[in-house]
Amino acid sequence: TSGVRVPHGDWIPADREGLTFCDATSAAFAMELPWEKLDVTTWSWQKVMGGEAAHGMLVLSPRAVERLESYSPPWPMPKLFRMAKGGKFSADIFSGATINTVSMLCVEDALDALKWVEQEGGQPAIVQRSEANLSALANWVGNSDWAEFLAPDVSTRSCTSICLTIGADWFT
């Protein structure tokens, strides 16, 4: 990690031809995401809300589903990645089909984390909490005589994957 984030989705054209892929592992639930411009978005349970690290989540936009239905690669696809059958999108993995046996403790852990998010005020409250944590750390860094953010640009500094560096003269 480098301690940075993309600050907004303004750079993604609304009339783009291709698909926009987003690894939102450190952003899901803790940052506002431009969902209307993201076609394939992934994250895992362990980030932001805490929890089990071995399981991933996938969100596909209607554009991504269209691509699945209109494009068939000339190479064999592993079963795990087959999301279309006979030119039609297969929603099996989005409606309960098991790809990999998930521990029910892991599922319960994720559900418990979602209940906590709801109890705290939902996703907007978690985004605010994450930004407040970054602000508290920024205040500390601002008063430190040795710590600096690895990402100097405030607009791209991540509130979840924070990286600090030693900036003291004696260290460099």
Report residues per predicted region.
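Conserved hydrophobic/aromatic beta-strand scaffold that supports enzyme active sites
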Residues: 40, 55-59, 161-163
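Active-site phosphate-binding strand-loop segment of PLP-dependent enzymes
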Residues: 1-25, 40
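Solvent-exposed alpha-helices and their adjacent loops that cap or buttress functional pockets
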Residues: 12-15, 32-36, 48-52, 154
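Glycine-rich, charged/polar anion/phosphate-binding loops
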Residues: 42-45, 94-97, 145-149
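Active-site C-terminal subdomain of aminotransferase-like
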Residues: 46-139
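Conserved PLP-binding catalytic core of the aspartate aminotransferase-like
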Residues: 148-172
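Catalytic P-loop NTPase motifs of RecA-like helicase/translocase cores
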Residues: 28-29
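Conserved active-site segment immediately N-terminal to the catalytic lysine
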Residues: 21, 35-46
